[in-house]
């Protein structure tokens, strides 16, 4: 009987030990599974972070490419604008030059004598040279006449009337010679010259005819 009790006690201890070993094995296996899951989760997290970083780097590269393309587009646009501005400036200059030429042509007045002109400077300074060559060197006739008239009016009467003109040549340089009648003094004229630079000068304010 004592042996039976002893045997049962030993069997109970053995089974208890086996059960404890089984629980320990289960706990060990659970820890291994948890560790493996944690490592897998960490690996997934690392992979996800790496993917995000790669995507972020790709995004930076795309943004850099976009900035480079934008800079190139802006530079091309600037160059295009500069070219267009230069072309517009050239066109404006050409237009201005054409306008100036047209104004010159439209304002050109052929030399003429005053109404009922007496031969005053034509007798004093008869011109037998090349009139076309002289007129090419001299300023616009009407401009020169107006300048000479203003100069003549500075002496004596200030409402002198244009009479006649001639051309004088000296060492290849030409000048207009104008006469202006003083309506308040019978037979008196002012003689005024205008050189090729447009400078007007009274040479005789009281020429008597």
From Swiss-Prot:
Biased composition range(s): Basic and acidic residues: 23-70
Subcellular location: Cell membrane
UniProt keyword Cell membrane, yes or no: yes
GO cellular component: plasma membrane
Covalent lipid adducts (S-diacylglycerol cysteine), residues: 18
Signal peptide start-end: 1-17
Listed name of the protein: Uncharacterized lipoprotein SAB2248c
């Amino acid at each position: 009987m004592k042996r039976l009790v002893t045997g049962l006690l030993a069997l109970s201890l053995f089974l208890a030990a086996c059960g404890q070993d089984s629980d320990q094995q289960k706990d060990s296996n659970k820890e291994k599974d948890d560790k493996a899951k944690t490592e897998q989760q960490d690996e997934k997290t690392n992979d996800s972070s790496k993917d995000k970083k790669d995507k972020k780097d790709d995004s930076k590269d795309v943004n850099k490419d976009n900035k480079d393309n934008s800079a190139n587009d802006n530079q091309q646009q600037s160059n295009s604008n500069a070219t267009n501005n230069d072309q517009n400036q050239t066109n404006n200059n050409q237009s201005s030059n054409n306008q100036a030429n047209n104004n010159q042509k439209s304002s050109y007045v052929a030399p003429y004598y005053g109404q009922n002109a007496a031969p005053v400077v034509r007798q004093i300074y008869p011109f037998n040279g090349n009139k076309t060559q002289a007129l090419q060197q001299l300023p616009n006739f009407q401009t020169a006449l107006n300048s000479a008239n203003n100069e003549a009016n500075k002496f004596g009467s200030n409402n002198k009337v244009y009479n006649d003109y001639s051309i004088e040549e000296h060492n290849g340089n030409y000048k207009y010679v104008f006469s202006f009648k003083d309506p308040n003094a019978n037979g008196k004229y002012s003689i005024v010259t205008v050189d090729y630079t447009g400078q007007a000068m009274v040479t005789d304010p009281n020429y008597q005819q």
